[in-house]
Design a protein with these regions (language model features):
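Well-ordered alpha-helical segments embedded in enzymatic catalytic cores
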Residues: 87-91, 142-145
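N-terminal helical cap/lid subdomain that shapes the substrate entry/recognition surface
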Residues: 2-86, 90
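Short, flexible active-site-adjacent loop segments at beta-strand->alpha-helix junctions, enriched
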Residues: 69, 108, 159
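Short, contiguous strand/loop micro-motifs
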Residues: 10, 37-38, 77-79, 101-104, ...
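Substrate-recognition element of Asp-dependent hydrolases with the DxDx(T/V) motif
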Residues: 23, 88-118, 133
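Asp-based, Mg2+/Mn2+-dependent phosphohydrolase catalytic module
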Residues: 1-2, 112-213
Length: 213
């Protein structure tokens, strides 16, 4: 049975609002609006470089910023900003109905909160397995440890990290442009294909031998 590995944030759900809201809380009174913030982030600029390049009134050291970020980014208050992309539920439902096994792999910290969010979205029965690195290991190491599912036709994600993971494991890598990296940034990691949104996965070469209709 063919299977697909999906990333979560930026791939199946819109989580940009959550990240920008937390950034604005921790680094107040900057010249950055959401568009400018994501322009920098999608170009691959990390928080340390970004914070050092702008005016703000935060007294946090970068190490303190990182600690607070990890403490709050998956709090219920901020997770409530997340919403599924309008096309994600129908895609997952259709793939499942075609006997394609769906796996979710995310670098989040708390498996129980991932499970709760999937239940909120009505997605808890779509995935054969949900894997959470808990920030304790890389996605690559997690997949090696548990074993890559049989007949994986693609791994889809919104970051260079996802593409690199797929490439190193010999999985067909698909980058998606709804998330945290721009097309120019994703191309640096040599994806097999780049798509505008996750529902376009059915039009990739990964599906050329799959009877999807």
């Amino acid at each position: 049975m063919p299977s697909i590995l999906f990333d979560l944030d930026g791939t199946l759900i819109e989580s940009k609002i959550r990240l920008f809201q937390l950034f604005s809380l921790l680094i107040p009174n900057t010249c950055l609006d959401a568009n400018k913030y994501w322009e920098k982030k999608q170009a691959g600029i990390g928080h340390e470089v970004l914070i050092s390049s702008i005016q703000h009134t935060s007294s946090l050291s970068f190490s303190d910023f990182q600690s607070k970020w990890m403490e709050l980014i998956e709090s219920d208050e901020f997770l409530n900003f997340d919403k599924p992309f309008s096309f994600s539920t129908s895609l997952l439902k259709n793939l499942k109905s075609k006997n394609i096994e769906l796996y979710l792999i995310t670098a989040r910290q708390f498996p129980e909160k991932v499970k709760k969010q999937l239940q909120t979205f009505g997605w808890d029965n779509f995935f054969t397995e949900v894997w959470v690195t808990q920030q304790k290991e890389s996605k690559k190491d997690l997949l090696i440890r548990i074993g890559i599912p049989n007949d994986v036709i693609a791994m889809i994600g919104d970051t260079g990290y996802d593409i690199l993971t797929a490439n190193e494991l010999g999985i067909y890598s698909v980058g998606v442009l709804t998330g945290f990296h721009s097309k120019e940034t994703l191309l640096k990691y040599n994806p097999k294909e780049i798509i505008e949104k996750v529902e376009d996965i059915i039009n990739t070469k990964a599906f050329q031998f799959i009877n999807y209709e």
